[in-house]
Curated annotation (Swiss-Prot):
One of its GO terms (molecular function) is quinone binding. NDH shuttles electrons from NAD(P)H:plastoquinone, via FMN and iron-sulfur (Fe-S) centers, to quinones in the photosynthetic chain and possibly in a chloroplast respiratory chain. The immediate electron acceptor for the enzyme in this species is believed to be plastoquinone. Couples the redox reaction to proton translocation, and thus conserves the redox energy in a proton gradient. Keywords: Chloroplast, Membrane, NAD, NADP, Plastid, Plastoquinone, Quinone, Thylakoid, Translocase, Transmembrane, Transmembrane helix, Transport. It comes from the Eukaryota. Belongs to the complex I subunit 3 family. It is a multi-pass membrane protein. It is found in: Plastid, Chloroplast thylakoid membrane. This is NAD(P)H-quinone oxidoreductase subunit 3, chloroplastic. The chain crosses the membrane at residues 9-29, 64-84, 88-108.
Length: 120
């Protein structure tokens, strides 16, 4: 027979953690005042009247730097457990970690040489 009673706490936590956000949205939708008007549609710029049109398109070049940051941040997350158990692990694991670090570095140097990190 299945031992589903072992997971009762999990199911209770899952149900409660699903019901709380739903209740929060429902209660705020019922209690919040609905006010529509020109002030609701205007952009707020630190209490100053906006100058010009707020719907301008412009190129954002930060995505490449954000992507590089995320890659190295994830790499740091994976290297932390390795660093904590460095004395127990052998030389082969050190070489594997070195390769793991070198792959994003080589990719970043390649992207830099190709001009992907240049402002244009």
């Amino acid at each position: 027979m299945f031992l589903l009673h072992e997971y009762d706490i999990f199911w209770a936590f899952l149900i409660i953690s699903s019901v709380i956000p739903i209740l929060a949205f429902l209660i705020s939708g019922v209690l919040a005042p609905i006010r529509e008007g020109p002030e609701k549609l205007s952009s707020y710029e630190s209490g100053i009247e906006p100058m010009g049109d707020a719907w301008l398109q412009f190129r954002i070049r930060y995505y490449m730097f954000a992507l590089v940051f995320v890659v190295f941040d994830v790499e740091t997350v994976f290297l932390y457990p390795w660093a904590m158990s460095f004395d127990v692990l052998g030389v082969s694991v050190f070489i594997e970690a070195l390769i793991f670090v070198l792959i994003p570095i080589v990719g970043s140097v390649y992207a830099w040489r190709k001009g992907a990190l240049e402002w244009s």
